[in-house]
């Protein structure tokens, strides 16, 4: 191997030891600083009781570890295995991503390894470039995920003041439950009437509304009242804003990861990267189309709930109340919206990573960026898409997805969730023990033979029962008072079911006994300790 000037490159035995030590120390220092920084960040999340963000950070570490495994696998297998795989020249001359150069195919390190008429599947140089692309993709995906949660939290800060107003006297007076109003005169219904009620124009209004005032104060307060009315008591002092933040942090755990279907999308994109097809051009606009459809659908859900209030009654008492339901979402599945947002973010990160990789890699810039204007447009669309998804669509999703039929687990804080989990686990253990005892008692009862089927002593003539009979006979001179220890030893020696006297219960006692048995799985009070320790 030689450099550009034709001078042979020095291998490791010809490299000064101080140079090797300096480079190695730099790599170790940077890696240790990164690991220490992630550890400190996780400790800060735990100290601030940000369990969802801590779990997202752990998932991010797992993704980076996966990328490390892929890199290690490529490094270990590129020379002895992959570069020595030979394919026919006909198979190697189809589906090229770039135009064929006039210089011909560059010689591979293992060009002499393959027989005549065959070439290497991938050269060591192309494997190294693929290695770099996978690393750049992981970095961009993690970076875009962090930007998404940061801009979403910044957007939701504007909703905090609306939540604070719900405790004021002005809000309670404006939402007096004894006040009658016409439905079409309420602010929420009035905002979504007019052109918004026309079937053909509603989608157009919803499309443009996601860019300008996607969530207003009246929308937030109305959806908040509908959620509390459906899942909590009507006069509850519930912090809806805090609940949305926890719910969004739980969804962030999904967004930050790269699932197997997303890896499949990346593989399919690379497979369709063929010269003349323009796959990377038209596929770069797919995330934008998906995101605009998602934002339009979320705005349509708010409109449909407003129109449902209008159709339900012409006069309402108190504030207008929406009814959460899964029927407003695609296929009655609110979680599908999160999947499309996740797909959009990953595909956008893939496009930006591919752009940076092709620009920074020698030899690829002329291949992928022959049209500078189109490349610049792709970058602008990608940045605008990231801002739109992070600052508008994702916060809108966090609010509107609460209008499903079921509330999310983030309705409880960390201490309450832990207490409920302990209660459930304890109840399961007690039920398992109770079922086991009943099964053992049934097995012992079934194992007791009948009177005429076995020469063994019957239940009434067992030594334990004979002992009880002997104790009850005062005229037997041989009988003596038996100590409790002797009775216990006899019971241990002959483990049979002892008949207990039957007590008849009146109806009141039966009801009391049934209620006490229903509460048999008692939970220790320590499980419901809400201390911050």
From Swiss-Prot:
Region (Calmodulin-binding): 414-435
Residues passing through the membrane, by range: 18-38, 63-83, 132-152, 252-272, 274-294, 336-356, 380-400
Annotated coiled-coil segments of the chain: none
GO cellular component, one term: membrane
Taxonomic placement: Eukaryota, Viridiplantae, Streptophyta, Embryophyta, Tracheophyta
Documented effect of changing residue 222 to I: In mlo-28; confers partial resistance to powdery mildew fungus
Gene: MLO
Biased composition (Low complexity): 449-463
Localization per Swiss-Prot or TrEMBL: Membrane
Protein name, UniProt field: Protein MLO
Induction (record text): By fungal infection and abiotic stress.
Source species: Hordeum vulgare (Barley)
InterPro entries per UniProt: Mlo
């Amino acid at each position: 191997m030689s450099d550009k000037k034709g001078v042979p490159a020095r291998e490791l035995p010809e490299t000064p030891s101080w140079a090797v030590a300096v480079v190695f120390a730099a790599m170790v220092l940077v890696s240790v600083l990164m690991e220490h920084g992630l550890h400190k960040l996780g400790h800060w999340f735990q100290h601030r009781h940000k369990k969802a963000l801590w779990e997202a950070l752990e998932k991010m570490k797992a993704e980076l570890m996966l990328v490390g495994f892929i890199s290690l696998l490529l490094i270990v297998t590129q020379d002895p295995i992959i570069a020595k795989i030979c394919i026919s020249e006909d198979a190697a001359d189809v589906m090229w991503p770039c135009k064929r150069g006039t210089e011909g195919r560059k010689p591979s390190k293992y060009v002499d390894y393959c027989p005549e008429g065959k070439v290497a599947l991938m050269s060591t140089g192309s494997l190294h470039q693929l290695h770099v692309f996978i690393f750049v993709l992981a970095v961009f995906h993690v970076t875009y995920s962090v930007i998404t949660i940061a801009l979403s939290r910044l957007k939701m800060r504007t909703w905090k003041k609306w939540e604070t107003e719900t405790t004021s006297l002005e809000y309670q007076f404006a939402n007096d439950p004894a006040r009658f109003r016409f439905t079409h005169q309420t602010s929420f219904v009035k905002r979504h009437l007019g052109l918004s009620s026309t079937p053909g124009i509603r989608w157009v209004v919803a499309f443009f509304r996601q860019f300008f005032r996607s969530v207003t104060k009246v929308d937030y307060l109305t959806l908040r009242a509908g959620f509390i009315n459906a899942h909590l008591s009507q006069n509850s002092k519930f912090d809806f804003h805090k609940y949305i933040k926890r719910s969004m942090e739980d969804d962030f755990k999904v967004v930050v990861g790269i699932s197997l279907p997303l890896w499949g999308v990346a593989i399919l994109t690379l497979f369709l990267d063929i010269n003349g097809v323009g796959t990377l051009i038209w596929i770069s606009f797919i995330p934008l189309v998906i995101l605009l459809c998602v934002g339009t659908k979320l705005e349509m859900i708010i409109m449909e709930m407003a129109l449902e209030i209008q159709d339900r009654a012409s006069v309402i008492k108190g504030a207008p109340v929406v009814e959460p339901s899964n029927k407003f979402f695609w296929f009655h599945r609110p979680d599908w919206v999160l999947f499309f947002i996740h797909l959009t973010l990953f595909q956008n990160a893939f496009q930006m990573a591919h752009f940076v990789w092709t620009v920074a890699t020698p030899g690829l810039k002329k291949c992928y960026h022959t049209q500078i204007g189109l490349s610049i447009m792709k970058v602008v669309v990608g940045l605008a898409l990231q801002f739109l998804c992070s600052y508008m669509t994702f916060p809108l999703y966090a609010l509107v997805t609460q209008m499903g039929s079921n509330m999310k687990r983030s309705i409880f804080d960390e201490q309450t969730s832990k207490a409920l989990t302990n209660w459930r686990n304890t109840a399961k253990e007690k039920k398992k023990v109770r079922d086991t005892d009943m099964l053992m008692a049934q097995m012992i009862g079934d194992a007791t033979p009948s009177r005429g089927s076995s020469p063994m002593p019957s239940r009434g003539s067992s030594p334990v029962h004979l002992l009880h009979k002997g104790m009850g006979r005062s005229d037997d001179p041989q009988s003596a008072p038996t100590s409790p220890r002797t009775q216990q030893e006899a019971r241990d020696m002959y483990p049979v079911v002892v008949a207990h006297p039957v007590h008849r219960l009146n109806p009141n006692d039966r009801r009391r006994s049934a209620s006490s048995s229903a509460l048999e799985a008692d939970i220790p009070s320590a499980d419901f300790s809400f201390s911050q320790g």
